[in-house]
A protein has these predicted regions:
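Feature for intrinsically disordered/low-complexity regulatory segments and propeptides
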Residues: 1-73
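Intrinsic disorder/low-complexity polar-acidic segments
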Residues: 64, 68-167
Length: 167
C-alpha cells in the first residue's frame, strides 16, 4: 500500500527466539520465549533502518499483525467510497502503528460547527495490548490526539487479540 511506503511503515515484524550470552561467553537461545523484531528495511530516501527489537519475553501464542494487513482492512471502505485514508503513523519507534481513515459520516451542529468522523486501527507491536479499531471525532495525528481519541465514547469499537490470526 502506498500510504505505508510514504509513512515509512512498509516493514514487517517477526518472532525470533530470545538470545543471550551465558557466563562463559556462549550464545544461548530460548525455546519458549520470543522477541518481536521489526525487520531491517530501506526507507524511500535509501536509508537502511536496522533490525530492532520491539518487545521481548513473548510466548508462541502471540501472533504479530503486519502493517500491510492493517492497511488491507481499510480497502473495502475506501473501494466503496465510504472513507478515504487520512493518516498513517507510528509511535515509540514502531511499537504502535496507527492508520486513520476519514469517513463520509460527518454532521453539523446547530450554529454550523462541522464534526468529522474518523475510523482508525491501532496495532501494538508491544506484546501486551490488543489491536484497537475505533471511530472518533478526533483526527489522530500524534500521541496526544491518539490519547484523546481513546478517552472518547466511540460509536464503533473493536478489539482484536494477538492470540488469533487477523485475516
Amino acid at each position: 500500500e502506498q500510504i505505508l511506503r510514504v509513512a515509512d511503515l512498509d516493514w514487517n515484524v517477526n518472532m525470533k527466539p530470545v538470545q543471550w550470552t551465558n557466563a562463559v561467553g556462549e550464545s544461548q537461545e530460548s525455546e519458549k520465549y520470543f522477541s518481536l523484531v521489526r525487520e531491517s528495511h530501506t526507507r524511500q530516501d535509501g536509508t537502511i533502518v536496522p533490525e530492532q527489537i520491539l518487545s521481548s519475553g513473548l510466548t508462541d501464542q502471540y501472533k504479530p499483525i503486519q502493517n500491510m494487513r492493517m492497511a488491507k482492512f481499510f480497502n473495502e471502505y475506501i473501494d466503496n467510497g465510504v472513507a478515504t485514508m487520512e493518516t498513517a503513523m507510528s509511535l515509540f519507534g514502531g511499537r504502535i502503528v496507527i492508520l486513520v481513515a476519514k469517513t463520509n459520516e460527518n454532521f453539523e451542529l446547530a450554529g454550523g460547527d462541522k464534526i468529522e468522523q474518523y475510523l482508525y486501527c491501532a496495532s501494538y507491536h508491544t506484546g501486551r495490548d490488543q489491536v484497537k479499531v475505533r471511530s472518533s471525532s478526533t483526527r489522530v495525528v500524534c500521541n496526544n490526539t491518539f490519547s484523546a481519541s481513546l478517552r472518547e465514547n466511540a460509536a464503533v469499537q473493536g478489539l482484536i487479540s494477538h492470540r488469533y490470526d487477523f485475516t
